[in-house]
Amino acid sequence: MSPSVLEIRGLRIETQAGVLVHDVDLQLRRGEVCTLVGASGSGKSLSCLGLLDLLPPGLARTQGQLLLDGQPLAASSVRGRLTSLVLQNPRSAFNPVRNMASHAIETLRQRGITSAVARARMAHCLDAVGLADTERVLQSFAFQLSGGMLQRMMIALALMAETPFLLADEPTSDLDALSQARFLDLLMELVQVHGLGVLLVTHDMGVVARCADQVAVMEAGRIVECQPAHELFQRPASATARTLLHAHQVLCRSQP
């Protein structure tokens, strides 16, 4: 039976200068999108990286328990087996001297898939994310593909890895409006079809409105509000959520 709920409880991230993330609780459910929203510098990306134990040098996760369907698990078992990560800057996710086929082969090898079966699996996953020209994409290097195509390639690698959960850190911020819309459409399709559980980090309330089932609002390293998306938009409980919603409404009114 596949896992259905991944939780982090009491996540704390510190430097020598002090605490940056304070006792964060998050819950991801299969088939749902949980958005972690807040202003720049609020601790969203750090929380995402802390969950995967991928913090940069000088930062440490000093507290926090991971649970899968209520059972404790080690952080080392989360990456690759349970979760995949989509980064804000897609080019930084790929080795620039290796083509896409090399990245795909490495991912599939971790699943014990090789030879002709691997090639068929690559083609299937690339087609699922809208990268139809399979051979051209697989022979391409990161500098030869657009940002939108690289984001899709990261999703394809997640499908190859067959992880039940996906963490996406500001995945649309470097994309143009059309590529952003296509990426979000793809993400929602994969949630519905494959039952992915997604943690989507964003500062864009438009993205939240479009995708979110649950919303966690972050300010100064703390979760200040967490509730279903439709309730947050109707009755925001925190000043931070009200400020974000007001800014979103002003921006929408200013657009032609």
From Swiss-Prot:
SMART domains: AAA (SM00382). CDD domains: ABC_NikE_OppD_transporters. This is Nickel import ATP-binding protein NikD. Its EC number is 7.2.2.11. Keywords: ATP-binding, Cell inner membrane, Cell membrane, Ion transport, Membrane, Nickel, Nickel transport, Nucleotide-binding, Translocase, Transport. It is found in: Cell inner membrane. Belongs to the ABC transporter superfamily. Nickel importer (TC 3.A.1.5.3) family. It catalyses: Ni(2+)(out) + ATP + H2O = Ni(2+)(in) + ADP + phosphate + H(+). ATP binds at residues 38-45. Part of the ABC transporter complex NikABCDE involved in nickel import. Responsible for energy coupling to the transport system. Residues 6-245 form the ABC transporter domain. NCBIfam families: nickel_nikD. Its main location: membrane. GO terms for molecular function: ABC-type nickel transporter activity; ATP binding; ATP hydrolysis activity; nickel cation binding. The complex is composed of two ATP-binding proteins (NikD and NikE), two transmembrane proteins (NikB and NikC) and a solute-binding protein (NikA). The keyword Ion transport applies. GO terms for cellular component: plasma membrane. It is an enzyme of class 7 (translocase). It is a peripheral membrane protein. The lineage of its organism: Bacteria, Pseudomonadati, Pseudomonadota, Gammaproteobacteria, Pseudomonadales.
